[in-house]
From Swiss-Prot:
Interacts with CDC27B and CYCA2-3. Plays an important role in organ size control. Acts as negative regulator of the anaphase-promoting complex/cyclosome (APC/C). Regulates cell proliferation during early development by targeting CYCA2-3 for APC/C-mediated degradation. Required for mitosis I during pollen microspore development. GO terms for molecular function: anaphase-promoting complex binding. This is Protein SAMBA.
Length: 100
């Protein structure tokens, strides 16, 4: 006989002793009250989401700062070959036509 099986639990014994109805089991469970300070599942989920979002934003801020610090490597002249190598497309600046 396993003491952990539902057939041998206190609620099952109470239900059988109370006439086999669910009223005995319900009465046994009604006597147990949860303290009001236990957080609900939704509150725990919301708190976990807030923590995850805060951690994510911290990591994203670090990444943005790193990219901003490295942005000098990407500044400067870029290839403009695509502006001059298509049929008849020339770089136009101030009304004059340039090849570069």
């Amino acid at each position: 006989m396993n003491g952990a099986s539902p057939a041998h639990s206190l609620v099952s014994t109470t239900a059988v002793a109370g006439g086999g109805g669910s009223s005995g089991a319900a009465a046994g469970l009604d006597d147990f009250h949860f303290p009001p300070d236990i957080p609900s599942m939704q509150e725990r989920k919301d708190e976990a989401m807030r923590v995850l979002k805060a951690d994510l934003m911290t990591e994203l801020d670090k990444e943005v700062k790193s990219l901003e610090e490295d942005s000098w490597m990407f500044e400067g002249p870029r290839s403009r070959i695509h502006l001059i190598s298509r049929r008849g497309n020339f770089l136009k600046k101030g009304g004059e036509v340039k090849l570069w």
